[in-house]
């Protein structure tokens, strides 16, 4: 959620600068994905795109009974009564469940408000469909969560038109997702010198240009 909101803040800055943000949902754009999509000026989806899932949930596993059967005891030293509130070794108290529910509700309300503001929808209407349900792109369009049916190229064309670009050869700059440790270990980055060299060069070019592009994963 934190990462989603950080990206959303950058999207707000882009929109505030006067640059339109056009969204192409692709196969799936649900939950946090829709949180971000709702920040766009115009949203394209395919009829069978999986989207929606507006809501928040938190779960945890309690293995207390299993530990008892195995004869394993968990001992802890903590600074406060609720420091281990989501520990798998004990159940939550009624008070703690209320605490967690309050936190979930707070994030949920932020989600609903974000969608209502971004889509210019009545908050109560958003709440009526913000029960975690998933939707197809077509269903989302009927509910006002998506603007039009279309693919990546439709979105690209619309973005060019919104930016006053009339040429058939629309200039597009793609940004990679970076290289993770998992990717390195799995062989995703087969040429590390090339990968890191390119990253360094890109960083230098961005520094010279005085701009910075956030990396979104």
Regions found by a protein language model. Give the residues of each.
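N-terminal organellar transit peptides
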Residues: 1-31, 42-46, 58-217
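Active-site loop architecture of trypsin-fold serine endopeptidases
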Residues: 48-56
